[in-house]
Structures are given as C-alpha cells and as structure tokens.
Swiss-Prot record:
Modified residues (Phosphothreonine): 180
Induction, per UniProt: By stress conditions e.g. heat shock.
Species: Thermotoga neapolitana (strain ATCC 49049 / DSM 4359 / NBRC 107923 / NS-E)
Family from the record: Belongs to the heat shock protein 70 family.
Keyword Coiled coil: no
Matching HAMAP family: DnaK
Stored CDD domains: ASKHA_NBD_HSP70_DnaK-like
Entry protein name: Chaperone protein DnaK
Top-level taxon of the source organism: Bacteria
Gene: dnaK
GO molecular function terms noted in the UniProt entry: ATP binding; ATP-dependent protein folding chaperone; unfolded protein binding
SUPFAM superfamilies: Actin-like ATPase domain (SSF53067), Heat shock protein 70kD (HSP70), peptide-binding domain (SSF100920)
Length: 596
C-alpha cells in the first residue's frame, strides 16, 4: 500500500474565522476549502446535548438554538486561566482552539488526499509569550508539529509578495478583524522582513460594528412594539446573524433589507416580525467613531517607528472589515494614497503562513525563496535585584530570536539559594512592572556575599516564547523556567506601561537613586565590617570602635529609610574608613608610609 503523501500548511487561527492554505509544487498558494465548501471556517465550537462536537459553520448555524453550549472568540482567552465548562467537563482555550485546528486539518487532508503533520500558525504581533505558548499547545493538541508561530502582519506581507519587490520599503499593515485591530509597520528589503512597530486595540473589530446594527434594530423594534429583543437570547442571535449579513452586503450595495419573521410574540399572543431597510449612510453614521478609533494606534505606530504617513510606501489590508468602503476611505484620506487591495483580506494571513511553512519545510514550490522574519520584543525583560530594583536583560524592541546573559551575585554571607524574579516593563522599580514568574536556584556553596557568580540568561525563541535560566558558575548548578505568565498584555496595556514609564520618569529616577544609595551604603558597611573583622588587630581601638558605631548608625538609617542621614553617614564612613588603609600599610611596611 502506497504511503500517504505529506503536506505542510499555514493556518490563520482567527478570533472570528480561521483559514488554512498550502503551497503547491509550482509555488502558487491555494486556500483549502472546508467540508462545507467554504474557504473560511468560523472559529466557533459547539457541544450538542447528544454529545456531538460541532466546529465551524455547523456550530455557527445552531448558535440560535444552543447559545449556552456554543463558544466563539476563544482566541481572546488564549494564555489565561479561563475555562469553558460544558456539563461536568472543563475545557481550556487551547483545547477549544484545538477543535478548530483539528477540523481545518481533517478537511484539508480529505481535500488534498494526504496527511498534514506540520504547520505554521499565526498570532497577533502583540501576543505575549503566554499567548504564543498557548497557540503552540493548541497545535500540538490538534496533532500538529508547529514549525513556527509567526506574526499575522508578517504573514500578510509575504502574501502580498512584498518580499520579492526587489527594493527596500516601509509597509503598514492595517488589520481590522472580527475581534481585534492591529496596525504594524514593517521594513522589507533583501529577503528580510522586520517588524519595527506595532500598536492596536484588542477590543475593536467587526463584532463592534455588528453590535451597533443590533442595537439600532433592537431600539427601532422596541419603539414599535415595546419589546427589547436583546433580552431573549434566541432573538438576539437572529439579530446578530442579520446584522453581520447586512454589514457584508452594505460593502457592495447602498442599501439592504432585513427580514426576521416571528422574532417575538406580543403580550396578546400575536406573532411579531422585524422588517427594516438599512442604508449604507445609516450604517456609516452608526459606526464612524469605530473607524476613527483606529487613528490613535496608527499614529502611535508611526511615532514609535519615527515615520510620517508620507514615509509609508505601501498600505496592505487584512481582515474582512477592511472591505467596508468607509474604512478604505479613511485609510486613503489618512495616508493620501490608495491601499493595496490585490489580496483577499480574509485569506492574506493564511497565504503568508503557507509560504513560510513551505520555506521552513523546504518544499519544492519554495525553492529559491528565502526569507528572514525579524520580530521584536514589545517590552523590556529583566529580573529584580537588591533593593527591589529592576535590572533589564533584554531591552524593548530587541530583535528576536535573542539570547542575553548577565552575571549576578549573592547579597548575604553564606547564602545557598537565590530567587530569580522575572519582570516585564519599562520602570526601574521591579514592583511597578508586570511580574511574570519566579524560580529558585538552590545548592550554591556557602561563601561570603559578592563571591558566588550566578549567570542569568534570557532566551527568546523564534516563536517569541521566553526561557530564563540561572547557573551558579562555581558549582555548575542550574535551574530554569519557561515564562508562561498569566498576564495577557493587550496593546493598551503595552501602551499604558510605556506611557507610565515616561510619566513617572522623574519619580522613578529619584527612587532608583535612593535605592542605589542604600545599596552602596550597605555594601560599604559590609566591606568595612569585613576589614575590621579580618585586620582589627592592626587598627587602633578608638578608630575601630568609632567605625563600628558609624556602621551601626548607617544601618539604622538604611532600615528607617532616612535618605538624607544615609547620605551623610555614607560620606562620613567613606572618609573615616580611608584611615584603615593607612594603618594597614604602616603595619605591612613597619613604619610611616611615604609619598611616591
């Protein structure tokens, strides 16, 4: 029996819809239709009362009858502790996402007549490491070897063939999907695609446009009949479907009719029907502010990249919402040029993922095509050090994959373990940043403080997942962790943290200087105390007693956080401790020290 042929695919695992594609031997990319014949699969999973699991269009179709057992937009929960409870079983977001991936895989295998074992899966540029790890886990649960997790805007740029343009260019990707808005600026040239800035709003998308239509129709119906359809889940589901359909039709038509017979029953028992005409101008007046909400993230991305709208060579569209004429007009007015509409915006990300999958797998169609994808870290990564300071190890906007190390030491004599506390953020004080996790390195041989050498390494792989390790260079003992932090950072979180760092710059600087002063004072007290302990017999008793008192006073001031007194006592102890050296030299030379 002949072995089944193996295929590698690219998958756009979307909030609202998902798409799967592959690269043919001739180098063209085909979007693979599902069992229902559609190239787009709704990211919806349903559990019927009989125990059947429905995915995609069949799940979406029965949402009206089974709203409590139907899950949509699970992508929003990736990387969190959220669980879906159906009957007596709980499902993680990864497991729900895996049902979607399994359907895509199964339908594509039936279409291609072979096996799919390897895939590239996409995620938003601003997914943090926990969300990326969850995406990878969903792929593994679905029976896929995930070759790479790549950023959606990067995939879109590949789909538009911009890596083959033969010139350096700045490209802006405007991605307005079902649940999220992302804007990314890429630098493309010589086969390298680099993400140089990203921004967005992870609570703005097609769902919000639908909601405006739902609310308008519900309010009109309420005015006519005194019944709020939004209070009946089945009626609301029918409204939602009608709103989505109307929105799609209004991208090509100037008006559309909505007809929902038997949507409700009057208090007297009469069946009520919803019949309405919606014009494009009405739709635009209801949603104009939503389109306007995309302006801020565009300006932020341009600002971060230090570019003006005129510096952008190409604007590419991703997400079905970019078909809306008002969205396209807004983009044209903002940039003064037409966006590139050469690729189906619903399919661009999956097409790009398929291209990258083919390159990584070395398939026939990808021969001669080599691309380096360069992503960046959204926030600085580092650890907490003495006094609660944040010590950066990988700065914000560092290109990944990356590996960086720093050497640290102990703060107490005889210390046999250290806790490595990992943070992400831009503030110099650790507690003001996002805590990602911690682990302990134990078994450090006892030694005076400052002697052990502990190498802390941060390693961010090509999927953006962070690995942290600590190694005692003396004993070779090592401990590590993969950062799967519970904190889901949205674009707004990232923006807020960067703005906070600017806003509190003066306050943070003062606090950092105070902590550094206390650390230096503590180090000096320790050093002088150690010298007195080791060489006390060579130092006059009155000086020794004076220094011991000064050390005690300095430590008291540190503990009381009396900064002016710490500064004064630190300076005094520094000057007074100089005398130790004189006596040690006298002792060593047997007399007066002479100037050279």
């Amino acid at each position: 029996m002949a072995e089944k042929k193996e295929f590698v695919v690219g998958i756009d695992l979307g909030t609202t819809n998902s798409v799967i594609a592959w690269m043919k031997p001739d180098g063209t990319v085909e979007v693979i239709p599902n069992a229902e014949g559609s190239r787009i699969t709704p990211s919806v999973v349903a559990f019927t009362k009989s125990g059947e699991i429905l995915v995609g269009e069949p799940a979406k179709r029965q949402m009206i009858l089974n709203p409590e057992r139907t899950i949509k937009s699970i992508k929003r929960k990736m990387g969190t502790d959220y669980k879906v409870r159906i009957d007596d079983k709980e499902y993680t977001p990864q497991e729900i996402s895996a049902f979607i991936l399994k359907k895509l895989k199964k339908d594509a295998e039936a279409y291609l007549g072979g096996e799919i074992k390897k895939a590239v899966i996409t995620c938003p540029a601003y997914f943090n490491d926990a969300q990326r790890q969850a995406t990878k886990e969903a792929g593994i649960i679905a029976g896929l070897e995930v070759l790479r997790i790549i950023n959606e805007p990067t995939a879109a740029a590949l789909a538009y063939g911009l890596d083959k343009a033969g010139k350096e260019q700045k490209v802006l990707v405007y991605d307005l999907g079902g649940g999220t808005f992302d804007v990314s600026i890429l630098e493309i040239g010589d086969g390298v695609i680099e993400v140089i800035a990203t921004a967005g709003n992870n609570h703005l998308g097609g769902d919000d446009f639908d909601q405006r239509l739902i609310d308008w129709m519900a309010e009109e119906f309420k005015k006519q009949h005194g019944i709020d359809l939004r209070e009946d889940r089945q009626a609301l589901q029918r409204l939602r479907d009608a709103a989505e359909k109307a929105k799609i039709e209004l991208s090509t038509k100037m008006e559309t009719d909505v007809s929902l017979p038997f949507i409700a029953v009057s208090p007297s028992g009469q069946p009520l029907h919803l019949e309405m005409r919606i014009t494009r101008s009405l739709f635009e007046s209801l949603t104009r502010d939503l389109v306007e909400m995309t302006r801020g993230p565009i300006e932020q991305a341009l600002n971060d990249a230090k570019l003006s709208p005129q510096d952008i060579d190409e604007i590419i569209l991703v997400g079905g919402m970019t078909r809306v004429p008002m969205v396209q007009r807004f983009i044209k007015e903002f940039f003064g040029k037409e966006p590139n509409k050469s690729v189906n915006p619903d399919e661009a990300v999956a097409i790009g993922a398929a291209i990258q999958a083919a390159i990584l797998a070395g398939t026939e169609g990808a021969k001669g095509r080599d691309i380096v994808l360069v992503d960046v870290t959204p926030l600085t990564l580092g650890i907490e050090v003495k006094g609660g300071l944040f010590e950066p190890i990988i700065p914000r906007n560092t290109k990944i994959p990356v590996r960086k190390s720093k050497i640290f030491t102990t703060v107490e004599d005889g210390q046999t373990e250290v806790e490595i506390r990992v943070y992400q953020g831009e503030r110099p004080i650790a507690r003001e940043n996002i805590f990602l996790g911690s682990f302990k390195l134990v078994g450090i041989p006892p030694a005076p403080r400052g002697v052990p050498q502990i190498e802390v390494t941060f390693d961010i792989d090509s999927d953006g997942i962070v690995h942290v390790s600590a190694k005692d260079l003396g004993s070779g003992k090592e401990q590590s962790m993969v950062v799967t932090g519970r904190h889901k950072l949205s674009e707004e979180d990232i923006k807020r943290m960067i703005e906070d760092a600017k806003r509190y710059e003066e306050q943070d600087k003062r606090l950092k200087e105070e902590i550094e002063l206390k650390n230096r004072a503590d180090d000096l007290a320790y050093s002088v105390e150690k010298t007195l302990r080791e060489h006390g017999d060579k130092i006059p008793a009155d000086l020794k007693s004076k220094l011991e008192n000064m050390i005690k006073e300095l430590r008291d001031a540190i503990n009381r956080n009396d900064i002016p007194r710490v500064k004064m006592l630190f300076d005094d102890l520094q000057k007074e401790s100089m005398k130790i050296g004189e006596y040690l030299y006298k002792s060593a030379t047997g007399g007066e020290a002479t100037n050279q």
